Design a protein with these regions (language model features):
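Glycine-rich phosphate/pyrophosphate-binding beta-alpha loops
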Residues: 56, 62, 152-157, 256-258, ...
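Beta1/beta-strand and adjacent pyrophosphate-binding region of the FAD-binding site
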Residues: 7-21, 38
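Short beta-strand to alpha-helix junction loop
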Residues: 69, 99-107, 147-166, 176, ...
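Active-site lid/adjacent beta-loop-alpha segment flanking the redox-cofactor pocket in flavoenzymes
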Residues: 239-329, 333
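Helical element adjacent to the flavin cofactor pocket in flavoenzyme catalytic cores
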Residues: 147-205
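Central helical "cap/lid" subdomain
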Residues: 199-248
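Glycine-rich FAD pyrophosphate-binding loop
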Residues: 30-51
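Dinucleotide-binding Rossmann-like beta1-alpha1 core, especially the glycine-rich loop
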Residues: 55-134, 254-259, 263-265, 286, ...
Length: 355
């Protein structure tokens, strides 16, 4: 029989959600000198959607100075977190290439690159031939150019989360797994605590980092959070013979996808232009590590673009594949939000991030 956790009666901050967002929030609050921080996770760390995130670490692409600075900081953090905590992050600075397939995108990406250089990112415009040298499987006969950041790359999302969690614990944060938040206590329009099956924790601040479940958690205190889960797909090929090691991540917005190495094969990820909503009435809470059965009929035409007419020289091995259908979080504006959702105090929300 599992011993019930012994929760503190009070914490200055209670963070709900143990994915990469929740552990990062805990780590950074503690790094800023905040004390008496508690993180609650319903299942295990990473068990929501973090565990199957693609792990792309990309600084290129934003025309927001704030977003660009966050990306730069994050890349630096992932590079030093292992030395700080002794926990690997899986950060591999293998490079990132975004390809422009027409004149309009070329003009757009040149503007983005100019802004990113202004912000201190070393973006290089490279020729189609150089794209193929870096990513030999790329089809480059119909692209205008690539935009290459050598220092970008990929991480292991589970390792990053564990490293952030370890760093948070080293700074005094208490992390409790297997403890769901079942209610948010309030008085006079302010949060006063969090209810769990193991007792209430009185608190001054609740940070909603519940990701796919952020809307449901917000509803417990009457806060409307405008996000919705949507289906999200990727393929993993079997081993591809003679695949060069450490190829950069390649992204092609005209094919709605990206390509990166996964083991001895490739992960081919899809960003559908029209997403399919998933569980409009709320995501299930009793199933950790969600892994949904692929809808091949719906995915088929996008798969054809990615593997046949996209920027990818398909090999026979790529036809033997494992598909994955997961749930991805979208918010109404299409961007992240970090705020008090209803203007009232003590309810910060980091719940509408797509990692």
């Amino acid at each position: 029989m599992t011993t019930p956790p012994s929760l503190p009666r009070h914490a200055r901050v209670v963070i709900v959600g143990g994915g990469v967002i929740g552990t990062s929030t805990a780590y950074h609050l503690a790094s800023m000198g905040w004390q008496d921080i508690v993180l609650l996770e319903r299942h295990q760390l990473t068990a929501g959607t973090t565990w199957h995130a693609a792990g792309l670490m990309v600084t290129y692409g934003s025309t927001s100075e704030t977003s660009t600075e966050i990306r730069k900081y994050t890349r630096d953090l992932y590079g030093r977190l292992e030395a700080e905590t002794g926990q690997a992050t899986g950060f591999m600075p293998i490079g990132f290439i975004e390809v422009a397939s027409d004149k309009d995108r070329l003009e757009e990406f040149r503007r983005v690159a100019a802004f990113n250089r202004y912000c201190g990112i070393d973006v290089q415009e490279i020729s189609p031939r150089q794209v193929q040298e870096l990513f030999p499987l790329a089809k480059v006969d119909d692209i205008e150019a690539g935009f290459y950041v050598k220092e970008d790359g990929r991480v292991n999302p589970v390792d990053v989360t564990m490293a952030l969690g370890k760093g948070a614990r080293m700074r005094g944060v208490k992390i409790y797994e297997g403890v769901p938040a079942t209610g948010v206590l309030q008085k006079n329009g302010r949060v006063t605590g969090v209810r769990t099956p193991y007792g209430d924790v009185q608190t001054d601040f609740v940070v909603n980092c519940a990701g796919l479940w952020a809307r449901e958690l917000g509803a417990l205190s009457g806060v409307a959070i405008s996000n919705q889960a949507a289906e999200h797909y990727y393929l993993i090929t079997e081993t591809i013979k003679d695949l060069p090691p450490n190829m950069p991540v390649l992204e092609d917005p005209s094919a709605y996808g990206y390509y990166r190495q996964e083991g001895g094969g490739l992960m081919v990820g899809l960003f559908e232009p029209v997403c399919a909503p998933w569980k409009i009435d709320g995501a299930p809470t009793d199933t950790p590590y969600l892994d949904l059965e692929p809808d091949w009929e719906r995915m088929g035409r996008h798969e054809e673009i990615l593997l046949r007419s996209g920027k990818f020289h398909a090999r026979p091995e790529a036809d033997r594949r494992r598909g994955a259908r997961t749930a991805r979080l979208l918010c109404r504006s299409g961007t992240q939000f970090h705020r008090h959702p209803d203007g009232r105090r003590s309810r910060p929300c980091d719940g509408a991030l797509d990692h």
